Regions:
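Bacterial N-terminal signal peptides
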Residues: 12-20
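Bacterial N-terminal signal peptides that target proteins for export
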Residues: 2-12
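Eukaryotic scaffold repeat domains enriched in small/polar residues
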Residues: 25-363
Length: 363
């Protein structure tokens, strides 16, 4: 996968990196959120040419203007207007789905209709520890719940429709769909489980051919990102991001344990853009690092929380190209918005940070 854009960014920014790196459903009726005017925050900062801009943050129902009745109808009413401890993210059809183990469910922000709701179903659909989620194009919801030892399934209106489980040790920590397959990370058995999307039947294990000491062995596979060509997996137990082809061949790894440039302390969520740039959030550094498809560090953004744009125990990152219209108003007028980078923070005042990949407006 050729990545000329990533290489260009790397040349421009690598000097800057070395100089600064060390340093469920119940809802509410709310007044329309007030837009906070803050100075534009760019990455890298001036005098370097910026490639990212911090746009805004979301921490609760005050970001949108009205409440849906869906959650009250389905779940009864426990009013929770603020996110507690958000983790996983999925963004589909103008709706941002946020796994929040702190409420035992999800927050759903419908930007198209300015609605905020808490999704905390009961009975067979009750969640214990919703960690990550995936929402398909039909708005069917898949929740990786290690507390239940299952991936829990819901239809587009929030009805519980089933589960994916394993007869062996099963602790699903992330879930993704690519084509007709459901991919699930399972740290308990050092591999991924792959299922048929339509039948929900088990197909195969991914990574089982490797043993301890092998480069491709997964000590604690926690998060994943699937592209047309490759699969990236966060191996939390080996402090690396591991790269495989779709057939399961190990290709390379990114990073190692340490506090230096391009290393990791607590690597968590990962995401890829269309040019092959890999985003990795690190709960230890409290930032996100960007790598090209050769594993070379390009830049980082965020940092321990001091103000807007910073992070506080970040957990997940997603890249989105389809919902730009809701955030263009935050972009500095000198720049165009290419796509969104969304990061969840488990602590601090800014729970969900929205960043934009930007490029200068051509005169």
């Amino acid at each position: 996968m050729k990545n000329t854009r990533g290489s260009t960014i790397g040349v421009i920014l690598i000097i800057s990196i070395f100089s600064v790196f060390a340093t469920s459903c119940a809802s509410f009726l709310h007044k329309k959120a007030k837009t906070k005017k803050i100075a534009s925050v760019f990455y890298p900062p001036s005098p370097d040419t910026p490639h990212l801009q911090y746009l805004t943050s979301i921490s609760g129902s005050d970001f949108v203007g009205k409440r849906t009745k869906f959650g009250t109808f389905i779940l009864g009413a426990e009013d929770v207007s603020q996110m507690v401890k958000p983790y996983g993210l999925s963004f589909t059809n103008g709706k941002l789905y946020i796994c929040d183990p702190g409420i035992g469910g999800l927050e759903i922000i419908d930007l198209k209709n300015n609605e905020y709701s808490n999704f905390t179903p009961g009975s067979n659909g009750q969640m214990k520890s919703p960690l990550n989620c995936y929402v398909d194009k039909n708005e069917f919801l898949y929740v990786a719940d290690p507390g239940r030892h299952e991936v829990v399934l819901y239809d587009s209106v929030g009805n519980y429709i089933g589960k994916i489980a394993d007869t062996g040790s099963f602790k699903p920590t992330d879930v993704a769909i690519y084509g007709d397959e459901i991919w699930v990370t399972n740290p308990d058995n050092h591999r991924l489980n792959v299922y048929d999307k339509h039948t929900k039947q088990f197909i195969r294990y991914f990574g089982e051919e490797f043993g301890p000491g092998d480069d491709g062995f997964l000590y604690s596979p926690y998060n994943l990102c699937i592209t047309a060509d490759v699969i990236y997996i966060t191996d939390f137990g080996d402090f690396k991001i591991k790269k495989y082809d779709r057939a399961g061949k190990f290709l390379s790894s990114i990073g190692s344990y340490g506090t230096g440039v391009g290393q990791f302390v607590r690597p968590k969520g990962i995401a890829c853009d269309k040019d092959g740039i890999l985003y990795v959030v690190d709960a230890g550094f409290e930032n996100a690092q960007m790598f090209n498809d050769k594993g070379q560090l390009l830049m980082f953004f965020g940092g321990p929380y001091k103000g807007p744009g910073d992070m506080w125990l970040p957990a997940k990152v997603v890249v989105d190209y389809d919902n730009l219209e809701y955030f263009k108003k935050y972009v500095d007028p000198k720049y165009n918005l290419n796509y969104l980078i969304i990061v969840s923070n488990q602590y601090g005042p800014d729970k969900i940070n929205i960043y934009g990949s930007i490029s200068p407006v051509k005169n």
